[in-house]
Amino acid sequence: SGTVYKGLAITSSNLYIADFFGAKIDTYSNTFVLQSPVNFPFSDPSIPAGFAPFNIVFISGLLYVLYAKQDGAKHDDVAGPGNGFINIFNTNGVLLKRFASQGPLNSPWGMIPAPCSCEFPQGSFLVGNFGDGFINVFSSFGAWLGRVKDINGFDINIPGLWGLASNPAFSTPNIIYFASGPNAEANGLVGSLTKCPNPCPCPCPNPCFNPCNPCNPC
C-alpha cells in the first residue's frame, strides 16, 4: 500500500524501482530481498518537494534517476515545461552529480545513449518527455543541445512518449525504437525512428541534431 512503481532498472546484483508515490527508489537484491535505504539512500535534498522518481535507467555502470512533478494524489505526473530533473547515482545509491535540471524537461521518462550512427554528438544522450512528447538531446555533461527533428527540420513529437531503445542485438544501429501511450494512455503505440539514407536533401532547413539530415552540421 502507498506505493506506485513507475519504472525500474536491473543490474547483475540488484533491482532498482522508482516509487513515485513514496518519492524514493526501492532496491531489491538479486534474490528479491528489499534492501535498507540506509545502504541505498538515493537521496538529494536539493530536489524540490513535490518531485519524485519517475523512472530509473542503468547506463554504463551508472544509475540515472528521472524525476517528475507529482499530482495531488501522488499517483501521476503533472506535465509542464521545466517539470523535471535528472540525477546520476552509483549502484549503491550515492549521489554523484545533477545531470539536468528543469529547462526542456517535462516529466522525463525514457533515456538512452544517443546512437552515433544517427549523427548525434559522441557521448550524448536522448531523453524522452512523457509530458510533451519531445525527445531532447543532451551532451555527456548534461548540456541541452536541442530536440530530435524530422527530415523537414521539425521537432518530432510522440504523444504519451514512454520508453526509448536503440541498437538491440537483432537490429541495425540506426534505428531508435519507442513506446507510447497516446490519448491519455487509453491506447498504446510501439514504433521506430530511422535515419534517412544519404544523400540528404540539402540545404537543410534546420540541420542541428537531425538524425535524418546530417548535411551542413552546426
Each predicted region: which residue ranges?
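Sequence/structural signature of beta-propeller domains
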Residues: S1-P199
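Cysteine-dense, low-complexity repeat segments
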Residues: C196-C218
